[in-house]
């Protein structure tokens, strides 16, 4: 079976995903979300960072479809959209070991 080269669009998306993951805070957020959904307050508390800073990082991840949101009352819950992103985060962290 012959593999074809990725399209320019696929390369653009992959490059953007890797750029967003290259930030320690965003990678930490994605790592936390491997275990399930969390609120911005819970993420900020776990990372010992201010809520507004975490909100800005989540907005960037959301724009790239790297996190998804679910509203419940006045709370927003963040999670990873699929197992491919989870695997990418796990593999990146294993590579660092």
Predicted regions and their residues:
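Residues in and immediately flanking transmembrane alpha helices
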Residues: 32, 39, 69-70, 92
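Beta-hairpin "wing" of winged helix-turn-helix
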Residues: 62-72, 79
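Short, intrinsically disordered or compositionally biased N-terminal tails of bacterial proteins
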Residues: 1-9
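Conserved segment of winged-helix/HTH DNA-binding domains
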Residues: 2, 18, 77-97
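N-terminal helix-turn-helix DNA-binding core of bacterial DNA-binding proteins
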Residues: 12-52, 76-84
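Residues within the DNA-recognition helix of helix-turn-helix
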Residues: 57
